[in-house]
């Protein structure tokens, strides 16, 4: 059964498959609220194509990241792999409950998800129990937790997305990865165009949303010179130096019309996950990633516009 799961998952796009026995999770973990009879959590990780990030790295094409690395992965590729595995398991008589991210549903009352439009998020939905995805990924042996609260894998660094299947089948466990990739260099923190990550790796979701969507004009080739006219702290916003609140974040996001959203409420990422790119470049330069390429990801000094253009 275990080998068949791995085979089907990889045939349908998964790159890494891991298994966590139920006893790795606290008795109050959400997985047992979702499915009390859970015996194993199956983790599936999928690479995000390195080439998709190159357009943002070069400042030449942005839509491919949002549509191909986020939307199609979350809405098509990953669910298909989950369903194929789950259908095989249920054909064998086991329960298989796929778990994907609820991009527009959250238990918190005043948080947000940078990847989707803030006004498309349904907040305070505590009845919809959700897994701790990063914690489950680590327990499934998919990778380790990086400083900026991102999964790091030996093959692809932070360039992965992942999902799970809960099952009552008892399957042999995958070893938990001993942390060895993240050296707390802080490059992810420094790379954020909106200073949304503190020195301990904690991410402010509203700060992240504003600059994920492109409020930093020095890293946004689509921003007009009259952007945010009339707003207090306009230059600080464009320079990535403004500290936003949930209220001011909403006002800023309402004025970001530089690029159209994708379907399913996914917002176009103008920052391109700068934190992840900086992390990947660092890991590649250290030579610790097992997936090798013929040329380095970063080929030249990072580009940046002059803030004086907006003054």
Where are each of the predicted segments found?
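Non-catalytic, usually N-terminal nucleic-acid engagement modules in DNA/RNA processing proteins
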Residues: 1-83
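Feature captures the RNA virus RNA-dependent RNA polymerase
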Residues: 13, 94, 309-311
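Residue-level signal for secondary-structure boundary sites
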Residues: 50-52, 173, 287
């Amino acid at each position: 059964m275990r080998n068949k799961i791995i085979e089907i998952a990889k045939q349908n796009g998964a790159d890494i498959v891991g298994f966590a026995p139920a006893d790795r999770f606290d008795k109050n973990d959400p997985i047992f609220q979702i499915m009390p009879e859970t015996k194993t959590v199956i983790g599936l990780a999928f690479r995000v194509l390195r080439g998709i990030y190159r357009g943002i790295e070069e400042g030449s094409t942005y839509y491919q990241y949002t549509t191909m690395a986020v939307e199609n992965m979350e809405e098509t590729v990953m669910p298909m792999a989950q369903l194929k595995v789950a259908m095989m398991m249920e054909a064998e008589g086991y329960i298989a409950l796929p778990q994907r991210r609820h991009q527009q549903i959250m238990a918190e009352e005043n948080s947000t998800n940078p990847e989707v439009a803030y006004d498309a998020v349904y907040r305070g939905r505590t009845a919809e129990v959700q897994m701790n995805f990063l914690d489950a990924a680590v327990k499934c042996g998919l990778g380790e937790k990086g400083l900026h609260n991102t999964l790091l894998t030996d093959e692809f660094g932070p360039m992965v997305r992942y999902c799970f299947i809960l099952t009552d089948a008892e399957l042999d466990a995958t070893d938990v990865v001993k942390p060895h990739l993240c050296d707390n260099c802080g490059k992810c923190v420094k790379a954020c165009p909106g200073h949304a990550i503190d020195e301990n790796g904690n991410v402010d979701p509203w700060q992240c949303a504003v600059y994920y969507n492109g409020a930093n004009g020095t890293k946004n080739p689509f921003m007009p010179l009259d952007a945010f006219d009339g707003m207090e702290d306009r230059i600080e916003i464009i320079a990535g130096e403004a500290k936003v609140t949930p209220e001011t974040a909403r006002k800023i996001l309402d004025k970001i019309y530089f690029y159209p959203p994708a379907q399913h409420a996914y917002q176009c990422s103008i920052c391109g996950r700068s934190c992840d790119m900086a992390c990947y470049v660092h890991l590649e330069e250290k030579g610790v990633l097992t997936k090798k390429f013929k040329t380095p990801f970063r080929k030249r000094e990072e580009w940046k516009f002059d803030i004086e253009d907006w003054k």
